[in-house]
Every structure is written in structure tokens, then in C-alpha cells.
């Protein structure tokens, strides 16, 4: 009877998770009441959620940027051919915004404000435009509330530094990928999922540096959940 009541659970994990970490995740799920635990690597779930047919012998490149990590993988025949996971996700972009405002203006802002700034004017594109956002925080000198107008152009360098590291990791994965699959990827391009993939200009940066087209998947923020 207990077996019938306990659910089977599928959990997504970063592609670079270690055996020790995997066991810890499984044990935690079992202690929480799971009967059976299945671990799915995030790029696989993201690809399925993005409606990519990974069952065929052709190669597909997926970039999934979550809150804490960016997972890159080349997928083919229902498996991962090459992969890399780096600890650079949406949270790192937010932290970069916080650090810039603190160092440049002595303005302290919270995580929610940083994310709002990133979503409203954050870009790594070649032409950031003239957009401006009013940032509200606390002046570190006076301790009083303060508002400052920040432009997309001045914010771009701190975001670009992180984005370039992600693109470099993608290049590393491609360099280790068999030539025939690289040819497929040149045709199909890269599919981007996760909340971090919504950063404006990231697709342009990938296209410029890697010479392949890049496209944000439909419902990018939900792809991993859908694919699970």
C-alpha cells in the first residue's frame, strides 16, 4: 500500500553533476517520500521541452541558462555527445548589476531590483540603444534612499563579460564535437533555453563569435520543466 502512495519522481540536474552529488539528490528525494527517482540532465530536458527531436543521428546544440549554471550540450541519438556546465547563470548577471552600481555610484540595490534592471535594459548586443531605467536603492554614504537613471549602454560591459565566458564554453564544446555533428549544428544552429537566455543580444553574440545562428526557444523559461 505504501508503494502505491509513494510517487515516482523525475528531477533535473546540471550536466556536470558528480556521482556524489547525484547520490545526495536521490537520497534526499527518497527521504522526502519518493518511491523511485530518475535524474535527467538539464540539457536533455531542455531539448525535449523545446520540441527538438534528439532521437535522430543529427546533432543539436542546446544552451540552458538557469539561475546558477549554464549547461551546454550537443545531443544526438537520445544522448549527450559533448557537454559542459559552468557556474554562470542568471544570478551572476544580477550580481554583476549589483556590483556595478555599488562600485560606480555607491548605490546598494537588492536582488529583485537587479533582476528588474537586467530584464528592462540589460543587453550584450552591439547596439545597446538609448534605453534608461530609474534604479532605486540606498546610498552607501548617506544611508538614505536614492534614485539614479542608468543606461543600457553603461551597463553592457559588466553583462558582456559574463556572456563571453558562456560563449567561450560553447566554443569549447563545439571543438570537442565530431565534425559531422558540427556540420548539422551549422545548419540547425543553437537553441537557447532558461531564463538567462532571454538576455537581449545574447543570440547576436553567439552568432558573431561562433558563426552559427542562435534562437531562443518558445516558452524558454519552462522548457526544462516541460521536458521533465
Language-model-detected regions and their locations in the chain:
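Nucleotide/phosphate-binding catalytic cleft detector across ATP-hydrolyzing
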Residues: 1-65, 73-191, 197-226
Amino acid at each position: 500500500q505504501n508503494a502505491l502512495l509513494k510517487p515516482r519522481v523525475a528531477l533535473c540536474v546540471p550536466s556536470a553533476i558528480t556521482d556524489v552529488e547525484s547520490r545526495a539528490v536521490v537520497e534526499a528525494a527518497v527521504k522526502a517520500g519518493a518511491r523511485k527517482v530518475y535524474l535527467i540532465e538539464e540539457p536533455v530536458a531542455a531539448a525535449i521541452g523545446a520540441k527538438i527531436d534528439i532521437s535522430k543521428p543529427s546533432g543539436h546544440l542546446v544552451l540552458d541558462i538557469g539561475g546558477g549554471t549554464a549547461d551546454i550540450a550537443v545531443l544526438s541519438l537520445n544522448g549527450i555527445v559533448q557537454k559542459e556546465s559552468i557556474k554562470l547563470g542568471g544570478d551572476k548577471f544580477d550580481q554583476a548589476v549589483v556590483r556595478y552600481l555599488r562600485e560606480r555610484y555607491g548605490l546598494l540595490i537588492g536582488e529583485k531590483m537587479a533582476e528588474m534592471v537586467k530584464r528592462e535594459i540589460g543587453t550584450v548586443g552591439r547596439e545597446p540603444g538609448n534605453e534608461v531605467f530609474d534604479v532605486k536603492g540606498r546610498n552607501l554614504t548617506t544611508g538614505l534612499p536614492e534614485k539614479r537613471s542608468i543606461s543600457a549602454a553603461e551597463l553592457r560591459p559588466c553583462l558582456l563579460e559574463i556572456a563571453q565566458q558562456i560563449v567561450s564554453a560553447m566554443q569549447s564544446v563545439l571543438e570537442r564535437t565530431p565534425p559531422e555533428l558540427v556540420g548539422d549544428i551549422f545548419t540547425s544552429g543553437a537553441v537557447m533555453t532558461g531564463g538567462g537566455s532571454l538576455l537581449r543580444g545574447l543570440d547576436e553574440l553567439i552568432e558573431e563569435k561562433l558563426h552559427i545562428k542562435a534562437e531562443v526557444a518558445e516558452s524558454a523559461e519552462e522548457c526544462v520543466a516541460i521536458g521533465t
